[in-house]
């Protein structure tokens, strides 16, 4: 039995049983392309068996490195962007208290985790340098090539900060490079400088890399249980190995999404009801958007954080265009709970909630919102998590990964490349005057009137 539950009771008015039956041949074909490595982009599909086939020796080194970081640092600065950032950020937030970095050292499981290299904002970098201040820190720089603009800029800044604080040689012992095993600028620098290195596997694309060293080192340094994370993913790998939709809820999710898309529901909102899950949505958006958005096809991935966004997006969801559907990730058992405090009088009108916990309010709110949105014509799917722990997160990660792999093949596209991102990079490099872009520089500067 699956550890997480996929609930489709609120799409009965939108998707008929026979439509799911009719999707089965397409899902079976997609499954064969995934399992047999015969589909487009198959060279980047090693994530399918990663929970069982990962490098156990490197995993042990990750655990040792995390312990070293915890012993000599108060802060770990994780430098990366896209898949080299979102997976780790998502998991660190999900598996730790909301204000983890603000807790006293004896109340935290691991070090404070801050992220850099995920934007070109000078203010962000400067503010982070000020936050670190005199605290001991280490750096985990994550880049397959070592030449991605945003991480490379941040790495220069924090590497020099380390060297200024500890000296050039001691600084090298505080830099952990997660990069290509054999080539690239970061690989070469790490080899020359003697940084401890971890591998980004060739067969695992960035958005699928959270269960590699890309995600595991920051997650472990935060104090979370990466063994339980991998166990959850391993059990999900086994659970979602059947090509039959009736026996595979991840494939059922993929099938339902495709049916809704064909009916004009082209935007999917991932909904959470816990602030610590905000970056689950950000990670999911990259996973879905980069995998499916090709050849003028694909479901547009968006998200909302409830109940907060009900006070901004609630009106549109309820009565706006009927081209969206919701997938709610609902935590069934909160990490902690609070009873609503007693107060004499009833000035705030909350006396009727006397004896109710705040999570009960959260649950009833989510149920009420779902009913209202379904009544308003919004198909509503739900993924129920029994607990907010590492095992459940590993399970959920694999659920979404295998679902989007199959979903991509049902669209007839390559789910594992992202050719479209080169367009903006070409324009950016040309405007910055990067060598090799001289002709494009003339064109783009002329378009800007410069």
UniProtKB/Swiss-Prot annotation:
Main localization (coarse): cytoplasm
Intrachain S-S bonds: none
GO biological process: gluconeogenesis; glucose 6-phosphate metabolic process; glycolytic process
Active site: 290 (proton donor), 311, 425
Reaction equations catalysed: alpha-D-glucose 6-phosphate = beta-D-fructose 6-phosphate
Protein location: Cytoplasm
GO molecular function: carbohydrate derivative binding; glucose-6-phosphate isomerase activity; monosaccharide binding
GO CC terms: cytosol
Keyword Cytoplasm: yes
EC number annotated for this UniProt entry: 5.3.1.9
Pathway involvement of the protein, from the record: Carbohydrate biosynthesis; gluconeogenesis; Carbohydrate degradation; glycolysis; D-glyceraldehyde 3-phosphate and glycerone phosphate from D-glucose: step 2/4
Keywords annotated in UniProt: Cytoplasm, Gluconeogenesis, Glycolysis, Isomerase
Its job: Catalyzes the reversible isomerization of glucose-6-phosphate to fructose-6-phosphate.
Family the entry assigns: Belongs to the GPI family.
Protein name: Glucose-6-phosphate isomerase
Source organism (scientific name): Leuconostoc mesenteroides subsp. mesenteroides (strain ATCC 8293 / DSM 20343 / BCRC 11652 / CCM 1803 / JCM 6124 / NCDO 523 / NBRC 100496 / NCIMB 8023 / NCTC 12954 / NRRL B-1118 / 37Y)
Origin organism lineage: Bacteria, Bacillati, Bacillota, Bacilli, Lactobacillales
